[in-house]
Amino acid sequence: MPAAVDTAKTISKKRKRKHGGSAREATDNGVATSPAENGVEGKATETTTELTKDKDVELAKKVVKEEAQKKRKVSHSPSDEEESESEDEEKKEEDEKDNVKEDSGKANVPDLPSVDAVSLPQPDGGPKKFTELGLSEKTLQGIKEMGFETMTEIQQRTIPPLLAGRDVLGAAKTGSGKTLAFLIPAIEMLSALRFKPRNGTGVIVVSPTRELALQIFGVARELLTAHSQTYGIVIGGANRRAEAEKLTKGVNLLIATPGRLLDHLQNTPGFVFKNLKTLVIDEADRILEVGFEDEMRQIIKILPNEDRQTMLFSATQTTKVEDLARISLRPGPLYINVDHRKEHSTVEGLEQGYVICEADKRFLLLFSFLKRNLKKKIIVFFSSCNCVKYHAELLNYIDLPVLDLHGKQKQQKRTNTFFEFCNAKQGVLICTDVAARGLDIPAVDWIIQFDPPDDTRDYIHRVGRTARGANGRGRSLMFLQPSEVGFLKYLKEARVPVVEFDFPAKKIVNVQSQLEKLISQNYYLNKSAKDGYRSYLQAYASHSLRSVFDVHKLDLVKVAKSFGFSTPPRIDIQLGSSLSRDKKQQQQGRRSYGSQPKGLKFKRKHEDD
């Protein structure tokens, strides 16, 4: 029997020398030590040394063997593996890499484990801060550098289930923090699966407008500062060949507009998307409103749907959004609406008002308001591109500097204007609804709706450019003609609180005579004014709320005066044209909001957006 004990001790010592040395020795032997492993080892030693003389040699060997097997089964966390991965394992991994062809061909791209195979952090209770979510240190570092600590309501309710791999249909008002709500889980997934460029694209974010896509790209870039994953953007108007080259090299996180994304999916052979794990559709209602329904259906059909997590965010829930959710989300998605119990549809820090003004006094009132608020940061919304062009040219000509943003501009011009206004502390941006969705422009003081929004949803998105964030403050002003006050009823039904603002007539700067003289003498401004006048009437005639915004009730003489004409100019226009409203919206949407896929061209005599 003593021989049995000696044998057991000898085995234990050998095992201890083999596995219980320093961390360096363990690493050299290809084993990553951890507190869990040391506990198992200590238990094995104690169990072995405490064997009584009544135990035989075979039992001692059996105990030692069982404990050794337990040790081999101890799982390693990703962080432990990174810190103490053995040289043999690294060599093996390099051999595997050499066997993988880097030509981005779909058949040769290595498969990745499913999202369900990765244990993503699942928070307990109701976390309020990002540090309570169990996120990776690299992601937390990016969030901290961005200056965020406490989550908004949409982030509190969506991030935990998204981290757990659930499909989510989220509804939240603009400015609520949706971008971080979907980017954080997406980046955590890429990090957990250790995506490499050779694995292709793991996350695709679809955005309705180029500017919103650029904004999401900027947020993703800050979040990924400490991560090794690659990221990129494909949007209409940009260099397609350069985009294709980047996609071929491997873009793990891709932000895109629908038309250009579909173009690359169909026509870029090196675009690897077989490993797609997450699809994010942001501002889904707007994507569908501007005519990309067919493209979205094709995109969803092309993309792999096995084990794919889908996040669909929409400020409003329409029938089309529900149809898109039905074909894109897996059965049993989680529906999260953070606004349905709230008293108002707009954010609390927003003071909203309207002013009733005759058509011929509209420009005079706008000019006076801008002159009195030169130190403020203001966005002015118009109904068409031509209206924006005319007013930008006019205001800049008369030494009231403004920036302009609309769908007829080249992409580089739009991008430069957007970032210039974002970085400005004061100034005026006049634009179409291309800037109404999702754009996070810092510290906007006033939103002016010079031309009426198409409906209450557009109104909400326009005013959402100010009072953003947890404690954001801002004000909005809507111009209404006496015949348009019926729109207030629709705002009340939509739970939008507005009050009437009073602007004394004596404070309005009367420059009407100088304006008419300038327009009559300056050929280029005269032509621009005619285009703006025509587009204003066409946009008015196509309004969805025709019972309120009836073009036949307009006083054309007064409208013409607001554009600088003493008498209405002769223009070629067809009110109530043969184009249906939906088709017209689709055409305007493609030009103003995103990229237009190949083979889709629209012929029209007058482009009025």
From Swiss-Prot:
Residues 11-21, 600-609 have a biased composition (Basic residues). The keyword Isomerase does not apply. GO terms for biological process: maturation of LSU-rRNA from tricistronic rRNA transcript (SSU-rRNA, 5.8S rRNA, LSU-rRNA); maturation of SSU-rRNA from tricistronic rRNA transcript (SSU-rRNA, 5.8S rRNA, LSU-rRNA); snoRNA release from pre-rRNA. Residues 51-69 have a biased composition (Basic and acidic residues). SUPFAM superfamilies: P-loop containing nucleoside triphosphate hydrolases. ATP binds at residues 172-179. Pfam families: CTE_SPB4 (PF13959), DEAD (PF00270), Helicase_C (PF00271). InterPro entries: DDX18/Has1_DEADc (IPR044773), DEAD/DEAH_box_helicase_dom (IPR011545), Helicase_ATP-bd (IPR014001), Helicase_C-like (IPR001650), P-loop_NTPase (IPR027417), RNA-helicase_DEAD-box_CS (IPR000629), RNA_helicase_DEAD_Q_motif (IPR014014), SPB4-like_CTE (IPR025313). Residues 159-335 form the Helicase ATP-binding domain. It is an enzyme of class 3 (hydrolase). GO terms for cellular component: nuclear envelope; nucleolus; preribosome, large subunit precursor; small-subunit processome. Disulfide bonds: none annotated. Keywords: ATP-binding, Helicase, Hydrolase, Nucleotide-binding, Nucleus, Ribosome biogenesis, RNA-binding, rRNA processing. One of its GO terms (molecular function) is identical protein binding. Residues 80-97 have a biased composition (Acidic residues). A motif (Q motif) lies at residues 128-156. A motif (DEAD box) lies at residues 282-285. It catalyses: ATP + H2O = ADP + phosphate + H(+). Residues 586-596 have a biased composition (Low complexity). It is found in: Nucleus, Nucleolus. A motif (Bipartite nuclear localization signal) lies at residues 361-377. Residues 349-519 form the Helicase C-terminal domain. Belongs to the DEAD box helicase family. DDX18/HAS1 subfamily. The Q motif is unique to and characteristic of the DEAD box family of RNA helicases and controls ATP binding and hydrolysis. ATP-dependent RNA helicase involved in 40S ribosomal subunit biogenesis. Required for the processing and cleavage of 35S pre-rRNA at sites A0, A1, and A2, leading to mature 18S rRNA. This is ATP-dependent RNA helicase has1. The gene is has1.
